[in-house]
């Protein structure tokens, strides 16, 4: 069921109504810092935020449409009590088709990988809005353990633990370059 939902959303996101594809990235207008950020992105981020067009998209949407739990900390200031179990929470709810309930536990805490198109103009970041700036989000993905030392993951089950995720080892200059690249994905 959620594959069909993802496909419907993907079709909408590929439409010209949503994607003008007029960004500096699309026009090939990157300065040296942004180009460095693009290289870093290709190494550390493109596995989930694909730089290749998916299916029939005319340009890259910077998402694979998959679901992961990246271990975001709880946002106690969002006014929503309790944990947000994401896809697993929905599949375990009375609103979900009964056929999917048995796989719900494996999906706890998972959220769809968002497109990064226009990401610079869509704060706050994270499914729960825990990070106010793009830089804070990148710093979390660079070293999530540092954030967890203060505020652990909201849903500790099923955390995505691909080698390097949350421990990229980027320095401030690299983080600034990556953020600069992400800003080039904004339509003009």
Predicted features by range, described:
Residues 1-39, 47-59, 160-188:
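Post-cleavage N-terminal segment of exported redox proteins
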Residues 25-132, 136-140, 147-152:
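Short glycine/threonine-rich turn/loop motifs
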Residues 135-173:
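Active-site pocket scaffolds in enzymes
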């Amino acid at each position: 069921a959620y594959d069909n939902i993802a496909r419907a959303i993907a079709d909408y996101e590929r439409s010209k109504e949503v994607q003008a594809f007029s960004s500096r990235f699309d026009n090939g207008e990157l300065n040296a810092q942004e180009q460095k950020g693009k290289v870093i992105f290709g190494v550390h981020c493109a596995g989930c935020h694909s730089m290749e067009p998916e299916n029939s998209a005319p340009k890259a949407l910077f998402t694979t449409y998959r679901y992961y739990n990246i271990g975001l900390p709880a946002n106690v200031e969002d006014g929503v009590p309790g944990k947000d179990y994401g896809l697993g929470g929905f599949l375990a709810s009375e609103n979900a088709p009964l056929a999917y309930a048995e796989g719900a536990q494996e999906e706890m805490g998972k959220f769809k990988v968002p497109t990064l198109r226009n990401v610079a103009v869509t704060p706050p970041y994270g499914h729960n809005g825990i990070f106010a700036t793009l830089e804070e989000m990148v710093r979390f993905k660079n070293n999530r353990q540092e954030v967890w030392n203060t505020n652990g993951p909201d849903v500790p089950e099923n955390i995505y633990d691909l080698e390097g995720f949350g421990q990229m080892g980027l320095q401030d200059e690299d983080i600034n370059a990556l953020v600069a690249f992400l800003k080039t994905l904004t339509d003009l």
